[in-house]
From Swiss-Prot:
GO biological process: proteolysis involved in protein catabolic process
Upper lineage: Bacteria, Pseudomonadati, Campylobacterota, Epsilonproteobacteria, Campylobacterales
UniProt xrefs under SUPFAM superfamilies: N-terminal nucleophile aminohydrolases (Ntn hydrolases) (SSF56235)
Activity-regulation annotation: Allosterically activated by HslU binding.
Assembly behavior: A double ring-shaped homohexamer of HslV is capped on each side by a ring-shaped HslU homohexamer. The assembly of the HslU/HslV complex is dependent on binding of ATP.
UniProt name for this protein: ATP-dependent protease subunit HslV
């Protein structure tokens, strides 16, 4: 269902300093054809305090972004309260329950996956989350690199997405990364 991208979020602490990164590839696929190689599917929200990225239908993803950003603003940037209210509001609207998109949202303290069905999932370790067609490749690579390699966080995100890009035909290695 969510062919055409990979998004990876990574947060934690290194040397006593908290960090948060999100990265994504630039490929947009329509059926079996690549229509764009340098799309931007990540952005920062609420005065650069929250990072987000999407996978899935572009129009649906923009609906997700708009709704989430409105709620985030109303909660003054409180990510936890925002995802809870997002889920509650989502369940009330029949149209929204059918969106074919997912988002990762994170800040220095939390990382969540928001689905087009209104589900909110906190990353298992509250550290790494991935979505999209290459999400499992990127997640596996990021977990391995986090556990065994001593890479800077930005480099870990970049290398994990490169691995996904090498394996997933709907993901390329034209990678963009944002950080807090």
């Amino acid at each position: 269902m969510f062919e055409a991208t990979t998004i990876l979020g990574y947060r934690g602490e290194m040397g006593g300093k908290k960090f948060a990164f999100i990265g994504g590839d630039g490929q947009v696929t329509l059926g079996n054809c690549v229509v764009k190689a340098n799309a931007t599917k990540i952005r920062s929200l609420y005065h650069n305090q929250v990072l987000s990225g999407f996978a899935g239908s572009t129009a649906d993803a923009f609906s997700l972004f708009d709704m989430f950003e409105r709620i985030l603003e109303s909660k003054k940037g409180d990510l936890f309260k925002s995802v809870v209210d997002f889920s509650k509001e989502w369940r009330k609207d029949k149209y929204l329950r059918r969106l074919e998109a997912m988002m990762i949202v994170l800040n220095l303290d939390h990382i969540f996956i928001l689905s087009g069905t209104g589900d909110v999932l906190e990353a298992e370790d509250n550290k790494i989350a991935a979505i999209g067609s290459g999400g499992n490749y990127a997640l596996s690579a990021a977990r391995a690199l986090d556990h065994f390699a001593h890479l800077e966080p930005k480099k870990l995100v970049e290398e994990s997405l490169k691995i996904a890009g090498d394996l997933c035909i709907y993901t390329n290695t034209n990678i963009k990364i944002l950080e807090l």
